[in-house]
């Protein structure tokens, strides 16, 4: 497609830690409404790639083009860019001191400056989508791994980002919980959400692409 449709374009991305080259000359793009799966074994640099895209790690070379601009340019507003990227981590990274609703509103209120009422309405919309609306008063420690990850997905959705990055979203889950998270991800993919998924699981790719 033409460049307007690319949400993120990675060009010649390199990342080294000392003399150890983890990423070498990586090129790919994520189009609006597309789901890109990066599949590889643990330790193959997949998570490093995501950490470079959301600038938790600074790439050693190359470009990350977002809306036509290289966000690695010094003048770029990294903070603003980061708010446009949703992130779902392997370990959920929920705020343990907040209940489920609070987890899904705190970023909206602090970063997007939404009112508490608006933030709660948005959060409820996405908690319903992931099937967690009846747990709004629960603390993370009261939830199963699958429930925590569904809350983490709702939290990312509540920021209404341009793309959501998923870093091994099912690898910390007990096998019987993987299905409920994949089901939510499949529904989101079918709804036209732009997603970049790093996983060592063929299961999600099979579900998504139907092979």
Regions found by a protein language model. Name each.
Residues 71-86, 116:
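ABC ATPase NBD coupling module
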Residues 54:
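Helix-to-loop junction immediately C-terminal to a conserved catalytic motif
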Residues 164-167:
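Catalytic Walker B motif of ABC-type/P-loop ATPase nucleotide-binding domains
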Residues 158-162:
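A short, proline-enriched helix->beta-strand linker immediately N-terminal to the Walker B motif
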